[in-house]
Every structure is written in C-alpha cells, then in structure tokens.
Swiss-Prot record:
Pfam families with a match to the protein in the record: SspN (PF08177)
Induction line: Expressed only in the forespore compartment of sporulating cells.
Superkingdom field: Bacteria
Protein family per UniProt: Belongs to the SspN family.
GO annotations of cellular component type: endospore-forming forespore
Region (Disordered): 1-48
UniProtKB keywords: Sporulation
Protein name as annotated: Small, acid-soluble spore protein N
Record GO biological process: asexual sporulation; sporulation resulting in formation of a cellular spore
Compositionally biased spans, kind Basic residues: 23-34
Compartments, as annotated in UniProt: Spore core
Taxonomic source organism: Bacillus pumilus (strain SAFR-032)
Gene encoding the protein: sspN
Length: 48
C-alpha cells in the first residue's frame, strides 16, 4: 500500500523525476494496475 502511495506522490511531484518524464511513470502505473486486475487505488486516494 505504501509503495502505491509513493508512486502517486512521485507523479504529483515531477521534481523528483527530473530527467524521467512523468508520462513514463504514469504508463508504468497503468500497466501495474492492469496486471493486478484491481481498481486503481490512486484515483481513490486522489479523491480523498
């Protein structure tokens, strides 16, 4: 769970990524969610 939250925060703060594009990270997260076959917790966290 904590790992997912970290991913979300990293997306919000592209400062940490710097050389890495945010789109790349987003794509990775999307793939992960698809593999897990579970609802994206990121969206729920964002709403809250």
């Amino acid at each position: 769970m904590m790992g997912r939250e970290h991913d979300k925060q990293a997306q919000f703060t592209p400062d940490h990524l710097g050389t890495k594009p945010v789109a790349y990270k987003r794509n990775k997260g999307k793939k992960m969610h698809n593999k897990s076959n579970e609802q994206p917790d990121v969206i729920q966290t964002k709403g809250e």
